[in-house]
Regions:
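C-terminal accessory region downstream of the catalytic core in glycan-modifying enzymes
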Residues: 163-175
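Glycan-recognition surfaces
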Residues: 1-69
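Aromatic- and carboxylate-lined catalytic core of secreted/periplasmic carbohydrate-active enzymes
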Residues: 59-103
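C-terminal beta-strand-rich structural cap/linker in extracellular carbohydrate-active enzymes
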Residues: 180-214
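Short, exposed beta-strand/loop patches in secreted or surface proteins that constitute
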Residues: 115-118, 177-184
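Carbohydrate-binding surface patches
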Residues: 105-164, 197-200
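Structured loops at beta-to-helix junctions and adjacent beta-edge loops in soluble globular domains
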Residues: 59, 66, 129-131, 204
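Hydrophobic, well-ordered secondary-structure elements that form the walls
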Residues: 56, 126-128, 169-171, 201
């Protein structure tokens, strides 16, 4: 990848396993160089559109499909995804990745859920997808994994986990009731009710206060 600016992450442009492939490729292709395609069909439900658009948060967003035949409601879901992507662009470009969820026995037929945490010292992007039998899963992930590891190790008083807040959410509107997303002690809890559903949450952390300065 040092010889080119970008590459298409896979030929799997319309399949449910896209988020699994895209996340695993973080090990070999920088997300800013990995083109993730959201192929939108005029028959797609809003749930499916959000699922496809959330895939693109694992790399460089690309859009195709029946884009000239979509309804206003379908385009609203796409526009919301584009707006969210712009807010998350910096952490996609500059962050590090950790993947949580069930180990997949088959990449072609994923099950349960996957949660990808992409983070810097100031921002965190959590992208959750449910797969077959994944609806109702209780997702519980650290939003700043390295900071939490430090917090449990040497000098916990130097790591401030209290200044974390959710700044944006992208999901199917009916799936993100307030009781389905919560943040406590640096961990984000998300509960999606249906199989093949997705949600993305962007968080920010205030810089730690230097207690040695007066």
């Amino acid at each position: 990848m040092s010889l080119c600016a970008m590459a298409s992450f896979s030929d799997a442009h319309e399949l449910v396993e896209i988020p699994v492939i895209a996340a695993y490729l973080h090990r070999v292709i920088h997300p800013a160089q990995s083109q993730i395609w959201a192929v939108i069909r005029e028959t797609d439900s809003i749930q499916r559109i959000v699922y496809s658009m959330a895939n693109t948060l694992l790399g460089r967003m690309c859009l195709s499909g029946d884009v000239t035949n979509l309804s206003e409601k379908q385009w609203q879901a796409i526009d919301n995804g584009i707006d969210f992507y712009k807010k998350a662009a910096a952490v996609i470009r500059d962050g590090e990745t950790m993947i949580f969820g069930s180990r997949q026995a088959s990449l072609r037929h994923p099950s349960a859920y996957q949660a990808v945490v992409r983070y810097t010292d100031r921002q965190s992007l959590v992208v959750v997808h449910t797969f077959e039998n994944g609806g109702g899963s209780d997702v519980n992930v650290p939003v700043f994994p390295v900071l939490m590891a430090e917090n449990q190790a040497d000098e916990p008083e130097t790591i401030d986990l209290t200044g974390i807040k959710v700044t944006a959410v992208y999901a199917e509107p009916c799936s993100m009731d307030k009781d389905r997303i919560s943040l406590e002690n640096g961990r984000l809890k998300v509960k999606l009710q249906k199989d093949f559903e997705a949600a993305a949450i962007l968080l920010e952390r205030k810089p730690a206060v230097d207690k040695t300065k007066k």
